[in-house]
Amino acid sequence: MRILYFDATAGIAGDMTVAVLLDLGVPLTHLNNELGRLGLPHEAFVLSDEQVQRGGMTGRHFVVHLPHQHGHHRHDHHDHRSYADIRQMIAASSLAGRVKDLSQQIFMQLAEAEAKAHQVAVDQVQFHEVGAVDSIVDIVGTAIGLDWLKVDRVYCSAVPLGGGFVQTAHGRLPVPAPATAELLKGLAVHADCGAGERVTPTGAAILAALAEPVTNMPHMIISQVGHGAGSRDFADVPNILRGFLGELPEQADHETILELSCNLDDVTPEQLGYTMEQLFAAGALDVWHTPIQMKKQRPGQMLSLLCRPEQKDRMVQLVMKETGTLGVRLQQMQRLVQQRRIEVCQTSLGTVRFKISQQGSKPEYEDCCRIARERGLALRKVQQIVRREYCHER
């Protein structure tokens, strides 16, 4: 599986995203040719890119030149378009199906965020900054680049909130602007940055529509690294978006899981054991407890569990109900799971399931326990016999 990880700790914008994809190898001529399928007039824009310095780092800067553009500002004049107009333009184009789908997903995120921020119907949303030709190029260009690179999955780091104020078509707004703040829901953010708009609406929409936020960079085999430079220079950090392109290890499946934990100092061993049983019965991937020293020198236990994201609410409810804790910590993480399958083997002691992976085979614990109880044998003896017979058959 080919994945792309965006290190957006310094920020992200639409032009920076396209610049990263160009730096990863997408030809500018291909981008230009594919954008021509949108049906915009030939004279609507001219594309260029160049290597620039941002705070001691080198990155590619992507520029959309407009016929009426003056100076270096990307939004001197705006072609106001409604979400319905843009949706129809993409649908009617001759772009590839996947490019259309990705573009529509991004614009839908933008439209819904703008509608909520300004209290209008989605189809009545008028894009100003986003509706300009250069931003349409940024969004559809991102989709074209991801398709050309054959990216299967996108991940992103935490993004900076920024600070201060920004001038928009709706007036002077705090950073992040209302629509951007809406788009940041569900994404990891940090405040370890100076003032200024570090995440634009277009950049936030790209992440909200296509990327899975992660606390740590996923385990991957990196093949290329791209650097996309923003238009501004910041005093605190280089205004660079990095993209790591690579593959997940073939022998493992990659998945997102959650770790939930809480500190306990007023539960009995019986209550703790019962809670763990209930969590396993509810589908927790793993549950354990760790002795800890708490405040006021009190001994306690840290109860921890792993679960899938969709199980979170049920698990939190169970932990609070059974332990009486007032809070549960949550951490999202990635794990690599060895590909495996189950084989059923007929042994001299009975039927035993074996878990098979590239690392070897292992009899199922529960099956071995059942046989040990039924035959009055030691568990380790049962495991030795069934392993030997399984290996002999193979």
Curated annotation (Swiss-Prot):
Belongs to the LarC family. InterPro entries: Ni_insertion. One of its GO terms (molecular function) is nickel cation binding. It comes from the Bacteria. This is Putative nickel insertion protein. HAMAP family: LarC (MF_01074). Pfam families: Ni_insertion (PF01969). The keyword Magnesium does not apply. It comes from Trichlorobacter lovleyi (strain ATCC BAA-1151 / DSM 17278 / SZ). Keywords: Nickel. The keyword Zinc-finger does not apply.
